[in-house]
């Protein structure tokens, strides 16, 4: 797949991914981290981390995630747990950076301004909403799921002719099938409480 979902398992529910991770599926780990990478990076950068420092924070969170996943009691709390771990690691990074700057004779006032911020609840809520949408897509019949992925998750967007060819459909039928699939997706999203 070009762009969009990088890994087929990324569309799996967190419950399914967590179980696969606990069963030793390396691809499930890759998919689970890909799903929450933006959440982790947004928190680290919100604490003023550079890209390199955010990379380090991400790696530290991944290690803690790997070690802590077997103890996770409720999969639904995964985004909030990851946000909490990331805030803690980002705060720790910020404290070390501040201490190092003080030893080197600079102060935080001398440093460029940063957005030292506690991630707002809406970031976690957005991650949870996105997860419920991915789960709704995952519940679609295979043809609808694939069509939704091709139409809405590919970057750059692909022409209908390419999609029709890949799926073995008549070009003129794509719009009608798309409408039916979107209606099914709307029902699945409604069932998910969105």
PLM regions: where:
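Short, charged helix-capping/linker segments at alpha-helix termini
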Residues: 2-8, 22-30, 41-60, 71, ...
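C-terminal flanking helix
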Residues: 37, 41, 62, 145, ...
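Arg/Lys-rich amphipathic alpha helix in sigma70-family domain 2
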Residues: 70-74, 84-105, 126
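DNA-recognition helix of helix-turn-helix
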Residues: 87, 91, 160-191
């Amino acid at each position: 797949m070009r762009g969009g979902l990088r890994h087929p398992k990324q569309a799996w529910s967190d419950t399914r991914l967590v179980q696969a991770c606990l069963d030793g599926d390396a691809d499930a780990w890759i998919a689970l981290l890909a799903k929450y990478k933006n959440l982790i990076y947004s928190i680290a950068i919100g604490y003023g981390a550079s890209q390199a420092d955010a990379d380090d924070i991400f790696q530290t969170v991944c290690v803690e995630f790997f070690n802590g996943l077997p103890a996770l009691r409720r999969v639904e709390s995964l985004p909030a747990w990851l946000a909490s771990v990331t805030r803690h690691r980002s705060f720790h990074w910020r404290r070390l950076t501040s201490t190092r700057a003080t030893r080197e004779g600079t102060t935080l006032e001398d440093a460029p301004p940063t957005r030292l911020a506690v991630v707002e609840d809406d970031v976690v809520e957005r991650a949870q909403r996105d997860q419920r949408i991915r789960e709704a897509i995952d519940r679609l019949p295979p043809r609808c799921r694939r069509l939704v992925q091709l139409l809405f998750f590919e970057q750059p967007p692909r022409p209908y002719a390419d999609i029709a060819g890949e799926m073995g459909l008549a070009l003129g039928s794509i719009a009608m099938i798309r409408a039916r699939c979107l209606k099914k997706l709307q029902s699945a999203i409604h069932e998910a409480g969105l």
